[in-house]
Design a protein with these regions (language model features):
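Helical "lid/coupling" subdomains associated with nucleotide-phosphate turnover
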Residues: 1-14, 29, 37-39, 46-205
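Ser/Thr-glycine-rich phosphate-binding loops at phosphate-binding pockets of nucleotides
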Residues: 21-26, 111
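Internal, well-ordered alpha/beta segment that forms a basic, Gly-enriched binding/recognition surface
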Residues: 32
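Short aromatic-hydrophobic micro-motifs that form the base-stacking/packing surface
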Residues: 16-18
Length: 205
């Protein structure tokens, strides 16, 4: 979280950090206010975690769970599975109110969200300087999800920022992103192509 410190907007009270992995997805709902203090001291202050959960849905596990279904059937079932995992969080009034009032935003960090961002930006090759720190609206990202679903698994690898290695996992990744964003339908997502290494370096200063 420290590595994503400067991605927190100054007027933000709360941040929902979504980290999509292969076997799980980590959700951290944090108090962003301590991060607003200036200088190195503020940079090293870890925002207090108000709520945290590790969900047993990742791009690999979700892909494997629905591999027996055709794509057009698999996606809605993947999405329904993800939505079932976050039902309790969706009903949390504090989270709903923070995003409804504009006091919160999402930070997304994972290969899935960075690949989706690259496609959304129309990059002909992956560029970290364009992706890291970029803002994505829900409308723009969901438009990319629909584009990838229409292309299908057979053509997923043709998108430059996806390629062959990640193509087989993107359908599940799209379902997770769509499901997670339902927690903050009015919130934009700040994209982070960073994480543990940057946080460790800052902690050593």
């Amino acid at each position: 979280l420290i590595g994503c410190h400067n991605l927190i907007e100054p007027d933000t009270d709360r941040v929902l950090v979504i980290d999509i992995g292969g076997g799980s997805t980590e959700l951290s709902y944090v108090d962003a206010r301590p991060a607003h203090e200036g200088g190195l001291k503020g940079l090293l202050r870890k925002p207090p975690i108000l709520a945290w959960r590790s969900l047993p849905v990742g791009v690999v596990t979700l892909t494997e769970a629905f591999a027996h279904l055709p794509e057009e059937e698999a996606y809605p079932q993947m999405l329904a599975h993800v939505m079932g995992q976050i039902d309790k969080w969706k009903r949390a009034p504090e989270i709903r109110e923070a995003f409804a009032s504009g006091r919160a935003h999402v930070i997304g960090t994972s290969g899935t969200v960075t690949c989706l961002t690259g496609v959304t930006l129309g990059l002909t090759k992956y560029r970290r300087d364009k992706v890291d720190g970029a803002w994505m609206t829900r409308e723009a990202m969901m438009g990319t999800v629909e584009k990838l679903r229409a292309a299908g698994m057979a053509k997923m690898h043709t998108f430059p920022t996806i390629g062959t290695d990640r193509a087989g996992l993107m359908l599940a990744g799209c379902a997770i992103v769509e499901g997670m964003w339902s927690l903050a339908p009015r919130g934009d997502m700040r994209i982070a192509d960073r994480g543990l290494r940057e946080g460790l370096l800052l902690s050593m200063m």
